[in-house]
Each structure stands twice: as C-alpha cells, then as structure tokens.
Amino acid sequence: MPPFFDFLMSAGIAFFVFIISAIILPGFFIWIGLKVVGKERDVLRCGMANFAAVVITAVVAFILHFTPLVLLLPLLAFLIYLYVLKTLLDVGFIEAFAATIIAGVVIFLLAVILLLIFGVWLLFTPPPAQMMHVKF
C-alpha cells in the first residue's frame, strides 16, 4: 500500500466540509431571504450564486484596492456583490438587497440564540475541580 492511500478519502471529507461551509450554509440563508421576499430558488443555486458573487467581488475589490477609493470601496464592493447576485439569481436589485439583509438578520438572530443557550449552559455548569497542591 502506498503511504498516501486514503488521500482521496481525506480530500473527499475536506471537499464536503468546504461545500457545506462555503456554499450550502450561505445558500440556505440567502434562500430564506428570497423565500421571505417571495422568490423560489434552490438552496444550491443560491449558494453557488453567493459564492460566485463573493469571489468576483473579492477580485474586483483587490484590483480597486490600489486606487484612491479606500473610503468608497466597501460600498462599491457591496454594490458589485448585489449586482452579481441579482444577475445569477434572476431577481431584481431591491429583492437581492432585501434577501441579503434578511439573511444577515437571520444569521444575527441565530448567533444571539446560540449565545444565549451557551451562556445559560456555562452559567449553570459547575466549575472544574481544583487541582490540589499545584502552584503555577
């Protein structure tokens, strides 16, 4: 057996983790935003459109980083992101904006709920036992 025999298996696991973390989860939140707006799109299509929009925006922002548009670059990058997202998802500009805002609110509320759950869990978890006769 070669030493890197299960390289494909480990690359497969890394690939699936990448797909889930970079495409499926953001696509799910964009899908929720589009569902609230009233548009029907697949989660995978939303995820791929979001991933492509982020990559294109990063490339354009990298190029514009060398210009004196430092103060306007975040707004310009967000507008480029919205334009690419609306083009790939076949929705209007306002609908793409609303979907991203709704997705951001959903992510924020999910983070608050998880923080509350883990905060209560940490509040009522007993502290670890003290190590006796140990000096640091």
UniProtKB/Swiss-Prot annotation:
Superkingdom of source: Archaea
Keyword Transcription: no
Membrane topology: Multi-pass membrane protein
Subcellular location, record wording: Cell membrane
Transmembrane segments: 10-32, 44-66, 70-89, 102-124
Main location: membrane
Alphabetically ordered keywords of this record: Cell membrane, Membrane, Transmembrane, Transmembrane helix
GO cellular component terms attached to this protein's record: plasma membrane
Descriptive protein name: Uncharacterized protein AF_1013
